Amino acid sequence: MTPHINAPAGAFADVVLMPGDPLRAKYIAETFLDQPELVTDVRNMLGYTGSYKGRRISVMGHGMGIPSCSIYSKELITEYGVKKIIRVGSCGAVRQDVHVRDVIIGLGACTDSKVNRIRFRDNDFAAIADFGMAQAAVQAAKNKKIKVHVGNLFSADLFYTPDVEMFDVMEKYGILGVEMEAAGIYGVAAEFGAKALSICTVSDHIRSGEQTSSEERQTTFNEMIEIALESVLLGDND
């Protein structure tokens, strides 16, 4: 057990899907996993372990922002032996060719957070996904005929940013989605010898104002989940 996870040793699979919302973790477990078992509920940050097509897999919420997701991902890796983390979350879009409900596979994550600089002795750290995991996710999407965007995310520290002109810079640099966790999870995985990938569904468009409801974010976005789960099976076959 840890201060934030009350699961016993061995309760988690070596691969954990991590949405931000613990209710989305509950939905994923109950909808996609066979015989899901609740293994942790500290602070109502729900975590489950079950199986998908016979493969043992866990799912657990990580909360909002880099500080929260860094705590949970670090403890899963160092205390529970987790080898791979797949963030399955929502993001905002700034580009006109990226639409609400589109799926993004985050090869890398820019950020305005200093957490990776703190880890990396004040040097820039290239927060990137594991190539094999990204490759498997792209292949899983192709197999299911799901269109995906593949490229950079931006992990922001502020949800309500005062620097709205930064969205113009993001669009210029080809940022596909704006969220709050990927860069932190990639940094934690690198520091502690694990692998990570972020797959996001566009929940709102920052330019057009189009958005999904909180209920939709909890109980839909199934294509992203299917890609993540199928990518685990493909990764096992490599």
Curated annotation (Swiss-Prot):
GO molecular function: purine-nucleoside phosphorylase activity
GO biological-process terms attached to the record: purine nucleoside catabolic process
Binding site for a purine D-ribonucleoside: 4, 179-181, 203-204
InterPro entries (UniProt xref): DeoD-type, Nucleoside_phosphorylase_CS, Nucleoside_phosphorylase_d, Nucleoside_phosphorylase_sf
Chain positions of site Important for catalytic activity: 217
Domain of life: Bacteria
Keyword annotations of the record: Glycosyltransferase, Transferase
Annotated residues for binding of phosphate: 20, 24, 43, 87-90
Pfam families: PNP_UDP_1 (PF01048)
GO cellular component: cytosol
Active site as annotated: 204 (proton donor)
Disulfide cross-links: none
Reaction(s) this enzyme catalyzes, per UniProt: a purine D-ribonucleoside + phosphate = a purine nucleobase + alpha-D-ribose 1-phosphate; a purine 2'-deoxy-D-ribonucleoside + phosphate = a purine nucleobase + 2-deoxy-alpha-D-ribose 1-phosphate
EC number: 2.4.2.1
Function text: Catalyzes the reversible phosphorolytic breakdown of the N-glycosidic bond in the beta-(deoxy)ribonucleoside molecules, with the formation of the corresponding free purine bases and pentose-1-phosphate.
Annotated HAMAP family: Pur_nucleosid_phosp
Subunit structure comment from the entry: Homohexamer; trimer of homodimers.
Family that this chain belongs to: Belongs to the PNP/UDP phosphorylase family.
Xref: PANTHER family: PURINE NUCLEOSIDE PHOSPHORYLASE DEOD-TYPE, URIDINE PHOSPHORYLASE
Name the UniProt record assigns to this protein: Purine nucleoside phosphorylase DeoD-type
Organism: Actinobacillus succinogenes (strain ATCC 55618 / DSM 22257 / CCUG 43843 / 130Z)
